[in-house]
Every structure is written in C-alpha cells, then in structure tokens.
Amino acid sequence: MSIVNSVRAQIPPIHREGYPFVGGFALVTLILFWIWSPLGWIGTVLTIWCAYFFRNPARTTPVRDGLVVSPADGRVSMVVDIIPPPELGLGAKPLPRVSIFMSVFNCHVNRSPVAGRIERIVYSPGKFINAELDKASEDNERNSMVLSTEHGQIGVIQIAGLIARRIVSFVREGQPLVAGERFGLIRFGSRLDVYLPEGTKPLVAEGQTAIAGETILADLKGGDAGRIYRTD
C-alpha cells in the first residue's frame, strides 16, 4: 500500500477543466483499439499527453506580505516598462511588466500573483497571433484582471495564442484571493502578463524558467525578511 501511495504522490491530479478532453481522448482510444491495435497505442499516448497537459499539481507558495509570485509556469519572455492596456485602468504611464510564455508542455493552471481583492475583470475579444509577440498583449483575445493590495494595484492578463483558443476564469469581481490561489486556465499554449506598481524592480530575467505560485517575480516591500510558505 505504501508503494501505491508513493506512486500516487508523484502523479498530479487532473484539473476538472480537462475531464471532457481526457475522457474524449480515452473514448477515441478504445475505438481505435477496436479498429486496429497500433492506432489504439497512438491514442493511448495522446490520452496520456492530454492528462499531462491538464495536470493540477500542488505548489508551495511564499506568502510574506509584498511578494509577487509567478501566475504561470513557463519562460519569462519579456521584462519591460510599458504603458498598460486601457482596460486595466492603471493609467497612461509605463509600468514594469513581466510576461511569461506557456508552451503546450507547461502546466496551464494560473495562480494569483499576490494576496488581494479583485477590483476588475474585463474580457476582450481579439486575434490569435503568436503570444510571444509584443503586440499580442493588445491584439489577441485576453482576460484582464486588476488586484488591489496594500502596496498598490497589480494587473494580470491571460492572453490567448496561436493554439490556445479558450481562456477560463474561475473568479469574479470583488472576490478576495490569496497568493498562489488558482484563478484560471488557458488551454493549449498562451501567455500571462503581470503589471507591477511604478518603481517596482522585477527579480526575474528574460529566459528564466518560472513556476506558478513559487517563483518570486518582485518584492513590493523590498528587503528579504523571513517568509512563510503555504502548500496548495
């Protein structure tokens, strides 16, 4: 029994958004096995990949006041100062922005970068160009959220990409979130932008690998006081 529990501990659960996809792949796989077994094995591989894509692992989040953690797994594709999109309502001055690109191999469950209350959620229809391009932040379909914290407002934008055609949000305006709490998901490759308060110095660099709920993007308080961690 201990061996079984050990194996289970190493396999993350599937997010509920993935149930229809994994179930569909599994059904097709059974049909393929009935038609011709080699096709069934191909279907098995695709079913396992689909389950892997929708994995929903626990993460250990540092929850000290002022820390901003990554909202997504992926690669830090841009760290720039840029004027935020108007739908965020964060003004017309350039703000620090950290962009994280998620490939189809990354976990796509998105987590709140800070503890705060959701002031605004705005959905914007748009195109589906390559999410790595800078103009994707303005041209692509996206879901924008503003979080109010003791240290200012944080903007978080889920951006669809070439393959990602479905942005899912689990939250509503006025809802409080804790750092690292799951708030959404984007299917099959995309990007997350985080807008930080003016004067904030990002602690990550372009090309760095980020882990949702764990990698620290910035420290709004400065310094490096002791941290407390929460696993979820």
Swiss-Prot record:
Gene assigned in the entry: psd
Cross-referenced HAMAP family: PS_decarb_PSD_A
Active-site residues, as the UniProt record annotates them: S190 (schiff-base intermediate with substrate)
UniProt KW keywords: Cell membrane, Decarboxylase, Lipid biosynthesis, Lipid metabolism, Lyase, Membrane, Phospholipid biosynthesis, Phospholipid metabolism, Pyruvate, Zymogen
Function: Catalyzes the formation of phosphatidylethanolamine (PtdEtn) from phosphatidylserine (PtdSer).
Entry protein name: Phosphatidylserine decarboxylase proenzyme
GO cellular component: plasma membrane
Molecular-function GO term, any one: phosphatidylserine decarboxylase activity
EC number: 4.1.1.65
Free-text description of this protein's post-translational modifications in UniProt: Is synthesized initially as an inactive proenzyme. Formation of the active enzyme involves a self-maturation process in which the active site pyruvoyl group is generated from an internal serine residue via an autocatalytic post-translational modification. Two non-identical subunits are generated from the proenzyme in this reaction, and the pyruvate is formed at the N-terminus of the alpha chain, which is derived from the carboxyl end of the proenzyme.
Class of enzymatic activity (EC top level): lyase
Pathway of action: Phospholipid metabolism; phosphatidylethanolamine biosynthesis; phosphatidylethanolamine from CDP-diacylglycerol: step 2/2
Feature type site, description Cleavage (non-hydrolytic): G189, S190
InterPro entries membership: PS_Dcarbxylase (IPR003817), PSD-A (IPR033175)
Organism field: Rhodopseudomonas palustris (strain TIE-1)
Modified sites of kind Pyruvic acid (Ser): S190
Residues in the signal sequence: none
Complex formation: Heterodimer of a large membrane-associated beta subunit and a small pyruvoyl-containing alpha subunit.
Record family assignment: Belongs to the phosphatidylserine decarboxylase family. PSD-A subfamily.
Cofactor: pyruvate
Disulfide bonds, paired cysteine numbers: none
NCBIfam families hit by this protein: PRK05305.1-1, PRK05305.1-2, PRK05305.1-3, PRK05305.2-5
